[in-house]
Each structure stands twice: as C-alpha cells, then as structure tokens.
Amino acid sequence: MTTAPTIGVFALQGDVREHLGMLTGLGVEAIAVRRPAELDVCAGLVIPGGESTTMAKLARTFDLFEPIRQRIKEGMPAFGTCAGMIMLADRIEDGTRDQETLGGLDITVRRNAFGRQVESFEGEIDVVGLDAPLHAVFIRAPWVEAVGDSVEVLARVEQGEAAGRIVAVRQGSLMATSFHPEVGGDSRVHRLFVDLVTEER
C-alpha cells in the first residue's frame, strides 16, 4: 500500500485553512508551509488566493521564494488559485512595476481582470477531468490572456461579459485556477491536483 503524499499549503497569506481542510478530506497529509524545512517534506504545494505582490514579499521575507522556485524548476507539482495563479505565471498584465512571480506556467495573466469587469461572481463551468459542471467562485480574480503551446486549457467562463476567458490551466506538473475551489465544499479540483501529485511521485 502506497502512503498518501504530503502536500503543503503556502501559509503566509490566503485561504490556508480551507485548502488544508480540502486536502485532509481527500486523505492527504496536508501541512502549512511557512519555512523552507516544511517545504522540504512536501511532494506538492498549493499556493492560495490572497494578494500576489504581498505574497511574493512575504515569501522573500521568510526565505521561501527561491526554495519554492527551485522546487518548481525541479518538477514539484504546484497548484495556484487566484493570486496563486499569478504567482505561477511567467508573465503578468497590469502587475506592479517590480512584481515578482515564481513562474513555471507559460501563460500571460491579467491581474484583477474580473475585479474591473464584474467584481466577484459565481457560475457553473465545465472543467476538463470532471464528470459534471463545477460551481466556481471568482473573487477579484485574474484571467489568462494567452497560453503557450504546452499549456492545456482546463476551463473557460461560459456566460456573461467574460464568456470565453480562460480560468483554469495545466502544464506538466503545474495547475492553476482563477477561481477559489476551496470555497463551497466541492473537492473535485483538489482531487485533480492530488492525482497529479501522486502520478509525479
């Protein structure tokens, strides 16, 4: 019998408790990551929503930025939600002048895109790999403006003024969503990430 993977949640900002609860409910050993030593034991990492510039600064302050970036380069699975998507993006539109990202996803993200358009909203979307539509919650969320050839689009907004916008992607061992899958009790997107981590072990 294979032991469950240990998956960390970047715990310096964002919906940390909600992500930990989702992962634990899926039978995973889930831990809060605030120090490099905690990152070292993780087979995968969730980067939650929050404020992306603040997250980057906190990661620098707590000596986590470069260790996370290096682990991602080495192939550690990571899953970014909302601001976490921005943190994993290689390119940002409407970012601050000195904004840093961890990178790894060959995507261009527009920061706070839904914030200017429709503020926060909820809606049903189809996600590749899920057997039924997902109720997605967007909170001043980014969207993906462009993807590289090796990026798989997992979901788009289906209705309203943002219809067609890309809101979930995967590239290799990295996943990201514009929406907050930890809100609302549906653990299927987290299950996709747990399966990804398990495949990569």
Swiss-Prot record:
Domain of life of the organism encoding this protein: Bacteria
Keywords: Glutamine amidotransferase, Hydrolase, Lyase, Pyridoxal phosphate
Glycoprotein as UniProt keyword: no
InterPro entries (alphabetical): Class_I_gatase-like, PdxT/SNO, PdxT/SNO_CS
GO terms classed as biological process: glutamine catabolic process; pyridoxal phosphate biosynthetic process; pyridoxine metabolic process
Active site annotation, chain numbering: C82 (nucleophile), H180 (charge relay system), E182 (charge relay system)
Signal peptide boundaries: none
GO CC terms, sorted: cytosol; glutaminase complex
EC number: 4.3.3.6, 3.5.1.2
CDD domains for the chain: GATase1_PB (cd01749)
Pfam families recorded: SNO
Pathway of action: Cofactor biosynthesis; pyridoxal 5'-phosphate biosynthesis
MF terms (GO), sorted A to Z: glutaminase activity; pyridoxal 5'-phosphate synthase (glutamine hydrolysing) activity
Protein residues bound to L-glutamine: G50, E51, S52, R111, I139, R140
Reactions that this protein is recorded to catalyse: aldehydo-D-ribose 5-phosphate + D-glyceraldehyde 3-phosphate + L-glutamine = pyridoxal 5'-phosphate + L-glutamate + phosphate + 3 H2O + H(+); L-glutamine + H2O = L-glutamate + NH4(+)
Family: Belongs to the glutaminase PdxT/SNO family.
Record text on subunit structure and interactions: In the presence of PdxS, forms a dodecamer of heterodimers. Only shows activity in the heterodimer.
Job description of the protein: Catalyzes the hydrolysis of glutamine to glutamate and ammonia as part of the biosynthesis of pyridoxal 5'-phosphate. The resulting ammonia molecule is channeled to the active site of PdxS.
HAMAP family: PdxT
Name this protein carries in UniProt: Pyridoxal 5'-phosphate synthase subunit PdxT
Gene it is expressed from: pdxT
